[in-house]
Amino acid sequence: MRILVSNDDGYLAPGIRVLADCLAKIAEVIVVAPDRDRSGASHSLTLDTPLRATLGENGFYRVEGTPTDCVHLGITGLLEKEPDMVVSGVNWGANLGDDVIYSGTVAAAMEGRFLGLPAIAVSLASAEPEHFDTAAWVARRLVTSLMEDPLPADTILNVNVPNLPRTQITDFEATRLGHRHRSEPVIKDADPRGRPIYWVGPAGESQDAGPGTDFHAIARGSVSITPIQVDLTRYAALDQVAGWLQRIPRS
């Protein structure tokens, strides 16, 4: 088995090294990751400039592009032999609830799924993560399960792991995505010439975080495993939209 590993924190991030070493115990691992931190890149694909990939001294390919670029390149042309699975992470910080929309970590896994491979996104749920080894151990267990019992073709796993030693993990929970309040306002500042600049504010606090959600699992010290899908269609709204269309004049 060949596993393509990527992330959005960059090829020198601690989480990707620990993950690659752990997965190397069960598979051949190839790392293709951004050359710098690309957190929040979401599913952006570089179309206006060429991509450059360089094999580093640590054996990792670093790409001047987004996490999605890395996985796309790794599957469709960079490697002599196509991988069997994509694992993205271990992310520095959680990807809970609405975070998945912005996450380059999740997008890297989703790109693997777009291109026909099973995929997992793994995040360590702490702003000051320490226990990357715990998250890597969880990923290795899930890789084995996923190969033995594949998910539906449009599905990936979004995995969040408490920042705890392995022995303190209380459980593994199948969860749904929770939701956050709206983001905090942008932070206004000034450049050295006094011109206004803005920093994107922090994510909102959890709002929908009750039992069954990814937020709740992490708060309990459990690993949260959320199956998420490529199809963004809101099926419950189709009939309502169809009703609108019946009332829209055709001329």
Curated annotation (Swiss-Prot):
User: Would I find Lipid metabolism among this entry's keywords?
Assistant: no
Where is a divalent metal cation annotated to bind? D8, D9, S39, N91
Reaction(s) catalysed by this chain's protein: a ribonucleoside 5'-phosphate + H2O = a ribonucleoside + phosphate
Recorded hits in InterPro entries, A to Z, give:
SurE (IPR030048), SurE-like_Pase/nucleotidase (IPR002828), SurE-like_sf (IPR036523)
Co-factor note (free text): Binds 1 divalent metal cation per subunit.
> A Gene Ontology CC term for this entry?
cytoplasm
Cofactors demanded by this protein = a divalent metal cation
* Documented EC number(s): 3.1.3.5
Segments crossing the lipid bilayer: none
Its family?
A: Belongs to the SurE nucleotidase family.
* Function per UniProt: Nucleotidase that shows phosphatase activity on nucleoside 5'-monophosphates.
Question: HAMAP family given for it?
Answer: SurE
List the protein's name. 5'-nucleotidase SurE
Q: Which species expresses this protein natively?
A: Nitrosococcus oceani (strain ATCC 19707 / BCRC 17464 / JCM 30415 / NCIMB 11848 / C-107)
Q: What is the lineage of its organism?
A: Bacteria, Pseudomonadati, Pseudomonadota, Gammaproteobacteria, Chromatiales
| Gene that this polypeptide is encoded by | surE
